[in-house]
UniProtKB/Swiss-Prot annotation:
Could be involved in septation. Gene3D superfamilies: Stage V sporulation protein G. Belongs to the SpoVG family. The keyword Hydrolase does not apply. This is Putative septation protein SpoVG. GO terms for biological process: division septum assembly; sporulation resulting in formation of a cellular spore. Keywords: Cell cycle, Cell division, Septation. The keyword Cell wall biogenesis/degradation does not apply. Pfam families: SpoVG (PF04026).
C-alpha cells in the first residue's frame, strides 16, 4: 500500500493541536481527521477516535503494525513541515 496524497489543515491557537491531516492510500482509500499534536517530547499524530459511552476513546482507524504507523507518521509530519516552511498566502477575493 502506497501513500498517494496527504492534506494538512493548520490549526492556529494556544492548544496543543497544531493541525489535522487526511491521508490517501493507492488513490482509493482515505483516512480523515488525523490530529497533529505538540506533546512534551515533540510533535506526533493521533489517529481518529470516538468517545465511547464509558467515556474512553477508541480509534476508528489505525495501523496494525509499527512499519505502517511509521510510514503514516513520517508522511504526515513531512507534509506538515512543508506547510509550515512554505505558507500559502490567502488569495484576495475577486470582485464580480
Amino acid at each position: 500500500m502506497k501513500v498517494t496524497d496527504v492534506k494538512i489543515r493548520k490549526i492556529n491557537g494556544e492548544s496543543r493541536l497544531r493541525g489535522v491531516a487526511s491521508i490517501a492510500f493507492d488513490d482509493c482509500f482515505v483516512v480523515n481527521d488525523i490530529r497533529i499534536i505538540e506533546g512534551e517530547k515533540g510533535i506526533f499524530i493521533a489517529m481518529p477516535s470516538r468517545k465511547t459511552t464509558k467515556g474512553t476513546f477508541r480509534d476508528i482507524a489505525h495501523p496494525v503494525n509499527t512499519e505502517t504507523r511509521q510510514v503514516i507518521e513520517e508522511s504526515i509530519l513531512t507534509k506538515y513541515q512543508d506547510v509550515l516552511n512554505n505558507p500559502v498566502e490567502d488569495k484576495p477575493e475577486q470582485e464580480n
